[in-house]
C-alpha cells in the first residue's frame, strides 16, 4: 500500500491522505482558530502515519482507531456537530491501513510564494503555515518534497492560467483599465479554482468537495500527484 499526502499549506488550504491514489483516508481543511494555526491538531492528522517508520508493535502506534483520532484533535470549545463537519476520516479505510505490513509513504507540499503587492504580515503568514507542515512531516519521519503549483498542475492536467494580459483600449482611462484588468484577473483565478474542484470531484466522487473547497481539491490532487510520482520512480 502506498500512502501519499497532499498539503496546500495556506490558511485556506487543506491536507489529504490517500491510499494507492484512490482511497481517501484523511481530507481536512487546515485547522485554524481566527488568524492562528493549530499545530497540535495539524500534527494529529498525520500522526497515525508516523508509525510507518517504526516496528509494527512499537509504542508510537497509539492512534489507530477513529475514536482515538477524534479525541486527539478535538477542540473542547467546538460544538460536536461543527467538529464532525470540520474533521473527516474514513474509519474503514484507516482500519484497513493499520493492518497492512507492506507500506510506503510520501508527502507533497505545495511551494508558497508571495504575490506582488502583498505586505510583510501576509508573507509571514505564508511562511508560517508552510514551515509548520514541513516541521510536522520531519518530526513524524514522513518523507516530503516541495513542488511548485504550476508543475503539479501541469502534470495533473489542471488549469494553470490564473493571470491575464489585457491591452488598454484607445481612449480608455487608466482607472477604467485598472478596474477591467482587476476583474479579469479575479475571474481567471475563480475559473482556475473551479477547474481544480471539478477534477478532484471526478477523481473522488465520494469525497464531498464543494464548489468553494478549492484548498481541499488541491490537497487531493497533490496526493494523487505524489502517488504518480512515487510510482514513476519505482518502475
Residue ranges, per PLM feature:
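Phosphate- and other anionic-substrate recognition elements at nucleic-acid/protein interfaces
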Residues: 1-235
Amino acid at each position: 500500500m502506498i500512502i501519499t499526502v497532499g498539503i496546500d499549506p495556506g490558511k485556506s488550504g487543506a491536507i489529504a491522505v490517500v491510499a494507492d491514489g484512490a482511497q481517501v483516508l484523511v481530507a481536512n481543511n487546515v485547522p485554524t482558530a481566527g488568524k492562528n494555526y493549530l499545530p497540535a491538531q495539524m500534527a494529529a492528522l498525520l500522526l497515525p502515519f508516523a508509525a510507518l517508520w517504526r516496528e509494527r508493535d512499537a509504542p508510537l502506534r497509539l492512534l489507530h482507531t477513529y475514536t482515538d483520532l477524534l479525541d486527539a484533535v478535538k477542540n473542547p470549545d467546538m460544538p460536536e456537530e461543527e467538529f464532525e463537519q470540520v474533521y473527516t476520516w474514513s474509519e474503514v479505510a484507516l482500519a484497513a491501513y493499520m493492518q497492512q505490513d507492506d507500506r510506503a509513504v510520501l508527502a507533497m507540499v505545495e511551494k508558497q510564494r508571495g504575490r506582488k503587492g502583498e505586505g510583510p504580515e501576509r508573507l509571514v503568514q505564508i511562511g508560517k503555515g508552510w514551515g509548520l507542515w514541513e516541521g510536522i512531516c520531519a518530526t513524524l519521519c514522513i518523507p516530503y518534497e516541495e513542488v511548485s503549483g504550476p508543475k503539479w498542475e501541469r502534470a495533473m492536467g489542471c488549469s494553470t492560467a490564473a493571470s491575464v494580459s489585457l491591452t488598454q483600449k484607445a481612449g480608455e482611462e487608466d482607472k477604467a483599465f485598472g478596474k477591467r484588468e482587476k476583474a479579469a484577473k479575479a475571474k481567471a483565478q475563480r475559473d482556475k479554482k473551479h477547474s481544480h474542484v471539478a477534477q478532484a470531484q471526478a477523481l473522488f466522487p465520494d469525497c464531498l468537495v464543494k464548489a468553494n473547497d478549492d484548498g481541499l481539491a488541491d490537497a487531493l490532487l497533490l496526493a494523487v500527484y505524489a502517488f504518480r510520482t512515487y510510482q514513476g520512480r519505482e518502475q
